[in-house]
Regions:
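Short, conserved, GDST-rich strand-edge loop motifs in beta-rich repeat architectures
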Residues: 84-97, 194-228, 389-405
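Repeat-based blade/solenoid architectures
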Residues: 46-67, 96, 116-127, 165-176, ...
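Bacterial N-terminal signal peptides
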Residues: 4-13
């Protein structure tokens, strides 16, 4: 793979409204080829199995984890893998404690390393960012129990959660970094779930299967329903110049309560300030619109993204933003429980409109229970396709509902002009698997230009789905280096022009469910062999344009400086 060292060409002015768009060039499109994924985890060194700590007591956290990350911890250009482990909720002191695992990527093969990341605990989620501006990616981990911040010092990590003020002891789930106040450093949002006490034996709990009875007249054992517990409040931490964090949740008007599972930042209203969406379980979802003064206004119901199609609260799990209909506006997807379709909300200006069934997402997702989700472009045709990681929360669900199963196939929906088609059955052996999937992440682990999938399965081996589509489509990958405290350009908006194709992407790593994707922007060009131009709106507000570029390379765009030459990974 080549990393571009071409001259950069910043175009005039700073407003996209004042620029002439590159002319559309007529091209003949080739026939559509299948998307093809192959499971390769064990063969490339990722033979790792998640421990969910499943017990006869069926403690609630056993069924909700876990996640992980594609992130480049050593700065060599290859995305490494971090897997978050679970373990027994009530541990036997004589038993070995499960730990998280870090795998170093060396040209597409992984080796397990320690580096100070073998963290014990009932792990849930992870987010990666260079919060202290020392040039390498740090990790924040959520747990059922105290969370922690792992500071990266040239490839070796140290636990500084307590010292940094972010060791909250609630049940943390998804988390994400972004510069919400635009002060030049990356802040942190942590979703919290419910107040579950494993020692509260005999407490009245609402089971998921309360309305079902076995042939013997009794309901089989069940994990509790989230309605059994009160929600815990999410947390917003302001970064204090890389020295630590301050809890500003109340001052920023983050609502108390909630049952947060998925979180993703995005500037959905295009005002230059990051907003926050939280997928909540069995209560209204939250959309926090940034007031540009350090506070937020909760607007989910008003904007049309707080409830399901029938106005009912749903079991929100994972979340992602993406411009699936190529109108320049970020749309929203949220995964839900079985018999609740995964939601697709189309941004149509001021509000969102439900597009779940009109766009083809509803019916394929109805029989499945989904957690992780990604907008991504595996066939590199320029349209954002949609992935969902599926698996039931009840290990014995087949006893009371023979239409479903604990392990489920994952879902791949192919986008053709804003309409999705279920292509899972034809997407290769990687989609033949039936697993209990939870978190998911996207990254190009083998550096061949197309996105691969990393899926974390509860109590099972993780899955690495290599993209072997062989479609022959062209691509460009964009890595960003922001100034003023945001070295990876998290939150930057990229608009790419290639003939008649215009793509809008926003760089963020933490999304989906409990997981972190590779910090780059993957652009599929289809049959087009050139990218005519790229516009980057940096979190600082600066707007720059670059190009043109030949396809098939990685561009490293540095705010205010242009393109940097780097060695090939």
């Amino acid at each position: 793979m080549r990393i571009s060292a071409l001259l950069w060409v910043p175009l005039l002015a700073c407003s996209p409204d004042t620029q002439d768009e590159p002319p559309a060039l007529p091209q003949e499109a080739p026939a559509v080829r299948p998307i093809h994924f192959v499971e390769v985890a064990a063969s490339v060194g990722l033979a790792w199995r998640h421990d969910n700590g499943m017990s006869p007591q069926r403690h609630f956290p056993e069924t909700m984890g876990g996640g992980g990350a594609f992130f480049d911890y050593d700065g060599d250009g290859d995305p490494d893998v971090y897997a978050v482990n679970g373990g027994p909720i009530v541990a036997d002191p004589a038993s070995e404690v499960p730990v998280n695992a870090l795998f170093h990527n060396d040209d597409g093969h992984f080796t397990k390393v320690n580096a100070g990341l073998s963290h014990p605990g009932i792990g849930m989620g992870v987010a990666a960012a260079d919060y202290d501006l020392d040039g390498d990616l740090d990790l924040y981990l959520t747990n059922f129990g105290p969370n922690t911040l792992l500071r990266n010092d040239s490839g070796t990590f140290a636990d500084i959660g307590a010292a940094a003020g972010v060791d909250d002891g609630n049940w943390g789930t998804s988390c994400a970094f972004a510069d919400y106040d635009l002060d030049g450093d990356l802040d942190l949002y942590v979703a919290n779930y419910v107040a579950y006490d494993p020692q509260a034996a005999g407490a009245e709990r609402i089971p998921y299967i309360a309305n079902y009875e076995s042939h013997r007249g009794q309901a089989p054992p069940s994990y509790p329903h989230p309605d059994s517990f009160s929600g815990q409040s999410d947390l917003l931490y302001r970064n204090d110049n890389g020295e630590g964090f301050v809890d500003v949740s109340a001052a920023a008007r983050i609502e108390a309560g909630g049952k947060g599972l998925g979180v993703a930042f995005a500037d959905y209203d295009r005002d230059g300030w990051p907003d926050i969406y939280v997928a909540n379980d069995a209560v209204r979802n939250s959309l926090y619109r940034n007031n540009q003064d350090g506070t937020f206004r909760e607007t989910a119901a008003l904007a049309g993204v707080g409830y399901g199609l029938d106005g009912q609260m749903e079991a929100g799990m994972g979340v992602d933003w993406g411009d699936y209909d190529a109108d320049g506006l970020l749309d929203l997807t949220v995964t839900n429980f079985q018999a609740e379709p995964n939601a697709l909300y189309n941004r149509d200006g001021t509000f969102f409109s439900p597009a779940t069934f009109d766009a083809g997402v509803g019916l394929p997702s109805l029989p499945l229970l989904a957690f992780g989700t990604q907008f991504f472009d595996p066939d590199l045709d320029g349209d954002l396709d949609l992935f969902a990681a599926n698996g039931h929360v009840l290990d014995n669900v087949g006893l009371i509902d023979q239409s479903t199963s604990y392990g489920q196939r994952n879902l791949l929906l192919r986008n053709d002009g804003g309409r999705f088609t279920d292509v899972s059955a034809a997407a290769g052996p990687g989609f033949d698997l039936q697993r209990v999937s939870r978190g998911s992440a996207v990254g190009d682990y083998d550096t061949d230009g197309d996105p691969d999938l990393l899926v974390f399965n509860s109590g099972q081996p993780l899955s690495l789905l290599r993209n072997d589509s062989g479609h022959g489509n062209h691509w460009i990958t964009v890595r960003l280096a922001g100034a003023d405290g945001n070295p990876n350009g998290i939150g930057a908006r990229v608009t790419a022009y290639s003939g008649d194709l215009v793509q809008t992407r926003e760089l963020r790593g933490s999304r989906s469910y409990l997981s972190q994707s590779q910090l780059h922007v993957s652009l599929g060009l289809g049959h087009r062999s050139q990218l005519d131009g790229i516009e980057v709106r940096w979190p600082s507000g600066r707007i720059e344009r670059f190009g043109p570029f030949a396809a098939g390379q990685v561009l490293v765009l540095i705010e205010g400086r242009g393109i940097s030459a780097q060695p090939s990974p």
